[in-house]
Amino acid sequence: MIFTKRLANEGHTRQLTIEHGITEGWIAREHDDSAIRTSRLHDWRRVELAIALFEIKALRLQDEGWLEITS
C-alpha cells in the first residue's frame, strides 16, 4: 500500500487508498460508505498528483469534523 487514509464522521466512513496494481501501474480508490471510485494510474507523476489530492481531501474532511481512523 502506497497511501491510505480512513476517516469517519457520524456513522459514515471514507477511505482513500493508492496501491500497486496486480499486473502493472497503480490503483487509486476512494470508498465513500458503499460507493467506490477507482482509477488506474500508469505514470508515477499521476500517482504523486493523486496522493496530493487525497491529502487535500483528507484535510478538508478533517476540517469538517471527520476523524482519522488508525488501525
Regions found by a protein language model. Name each.
Residues 1-25:
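Short N-terminal "domain-start" leader segments
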Residues 8, 29-33:
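A generic structural motif
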Residues 14, 48, 57-71:
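Short, mixed-charge low-complexity intrinsically disordered segments
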Residues 18-20, 37, 57-59:
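Intrinsically disordered, low-complexity regions enriched in Ser/Pro/Gly/Gln/His and often acidic
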Residues 19, 31, 52:
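Surface loops and adjacent helix of pleckstrin homology
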Residues 24-27, 45-54:
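Short, surface-exposed linear segments at secondary-structure transitions and domain or protein termini
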Residues 32-49:
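A short, exposed loop/beta-hairpin motif centered on an aromatic-Gly-Thr core
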